[in-house]
Amino acid sequence: MARRSQGTKLHLAVLCLVVSCHAIGLSDLMERASQRSDKLHSLSTSLTKDLDSHFPPMGRVMMPRPSMCHTSSLQTPKDKEQALKVSENELISLARYLLLAWNDPLLLLSSEAPTLPHTPSNGDISSKIRELQDYSKSLGDGLDIMVNKMGPSSQYISSIPFKGGDLGNDKTSRLINFHFLMSCFRRDSHKIDSFLKVLRCRATNMRPETC
């Protein structure tokens, strides 16, 4: 019941965001999006740390390299200095592109979390995955509104294919692949958060070095 109440409140907040965002300025929209992306990255970091505490040493050796993340082919700025050189339209398109790429993987993580092996706090993990989905949806809705305000040059978007339909058959593979996907998401949520913070700085005319 508590979970349903929390989900209802967030859903209502999203509806209010969608309705009210059409009437407010771009800088305020940037601020709201930045707050949501910050929460998204904070949640993914917390969840990754939870998994780390239950991850066997051998699993770290067996876990795929970051270059195996399904979004690794997307060319993005590597740091803040590079992001500051990218146009506003391109940055918001990259943020939306990355966010959209995680719709299916987050569904997979949500379905696997309740029966994840070797993790006594499955309920907490499942709850945080659902929160990630909620905040991802909320942020995506906000970015769509921002794009409409910024013009047609920001509106093209396609999805990055995700081919991982399952996490494996044995317990070790499932845990390793779950942890790997979460590590990839944490990396991408950091990128999204960084891009939106740069956009927020530009919208409020802050000096680049303070972004």
Swiss-Prot record:
* GO MF assignments: hormone activity; prolactin receptor binding; superoxide-generating NADPH oxidase activator activity
**An example Gene Ontology biological process:** positive regulation of gene expression
Task: Please provide the record's keywords in A-Z order.
Answer: Disulfide bond, Hormone, Secreted, Signal
Which family does the entry's similarity section mention? Belongs to the somatotropin/prolactin family.
The record's annotation in InterPro entries points to: 4_helix_cytokine-like_core, Somatotropin/Prolactin, Somatotropin_CS
Give the intrachain disulfide bonds: C69-C184, C201-C211
Entry's Gene Ontology cellular component terms: extracellular space
Instruction: Fetch the Pfam families from UniProt.
Output: Hormone_1 (PF00103)
**Signal peptide (residue range):** 1-23
Primary localization: secreted
Tell me which domain of life the UniProt entry assigns to the organism this sequence originates from: Eukaryota
Its annotated compartments are: Secreted
Designated name of the protein: Prolactin-1
